[in-house]
Amino acid sequence: AKKTPGPEYLEPKAISGDHGLMLEERGAYGVIASITPSTNPVATVINNSITMLSAGNTVVFGFHPNAKNCCIKMVSILNDAIISVGGPGNLINTIENPSMEASTELMRHEDVKLVCVTGGPGVVKVAFSCGKKVIAAGPGNPPVVIDETADLDKAAKDVVNGASFDNNIMCIAEKECIILNPVFDKVREKMKQHGAFELKGEEITKVMKVVFDSNGQLIRKWCGKDAKVILKEIGIHVSDEIKLIIAEVDRNHPFVEEEMLMPILPLVRASNIDEAIDIAIVAEHGYFHTAMMHSHSIENLHKMASRINTTIFVKNGPSFSGLGFNGEGHTTLTIAGPTGEGCTTPKSFTRERRCVLIDYFRIV
């Protein structure tokens, strides 16, 4: 909440000239329908509520059914907080029994002027079919590249911390790690020193059978589970210090191609920086969401930043630094790459309004 921007982002703009004064201000849309996923639900409610209300709107949430109870509780806490400082009640609302059908009805309601949606292709498609302004935060599969010029110990620690944060449930977290071959083994060993457990040989296959069904689909019940819980399922018992599972795989492995949303990080070898960036671009799937790179080469950092073309690009830090944690800038949990708003602020949830007065109000 402390890192989420408020009304201070809504600065008016005035221009005076020979023909008078022009004033531009940011105006509220009114009622916003905010459709949220089961991943990172409570923090998203807090973040979206602050930014949307700061812009002068009210919001009605359509939660994922799996996150119903915690989100409804948070809405109640936020409304009580608003009332306690003299604000009106029920600025934040929710569907009592959330479902895809109920969320669709909400988005299409005539009083809803703006739709903000975070989710898969299905719900995003429905949002665009409503004929309203849509702010869409799509999926991500963020790659991280480590080259031979990086501070290898720091890079390994940052990647482990970023990929294991909230058990990899966040869309910005490192989902695959591409390492240049000359430093691959060193980075892998340093990751193990910082809390990673390496799968080898048949162990990789065993974990795949746990987290994927027979049709190759991700089994959602494993999303967000602790690394030790997943390892226990294949008969490996580790201490609480283990927070991430790593495994060396090829670039086409399901661990690389899928947004796993669990603390499993595939490691992929690359022979040079251009190959590493090529692998990262393919793995990112053109979502233009988030990417990271650890390097002391300005040329390599520039090359990847320009080619990967993501909304967030973190240099020499963990993924969560891109949201202002141990990094600069504001925090957002609605990263609207598909519709171009990027890291949303209160300004994202406003309309630009202009007022012009002819021939008056200029004082010089």
What is each model feature region?
Residues 1-22, 193:
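N-terminal Rossmann-like NAD(P)+-binding subdomain of aldehyde/semialdehyde dehydrogenases
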Residues 60-65, 178, 316-317:
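Short internal beta-strands
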Residues 107-110, 151, 212-220, 259, ...:
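Short, surface-exposed amphipathic charged segments that create phosphate/polyanion-binding patches used
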Residues 12-154:
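Rossmann-like NAD(P) dinucleotide-binding subdomain of oxidoreductase/dehydrogenase enzymes
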Residues 46, 124-251:
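ALDH superfamily catalytic-core signature
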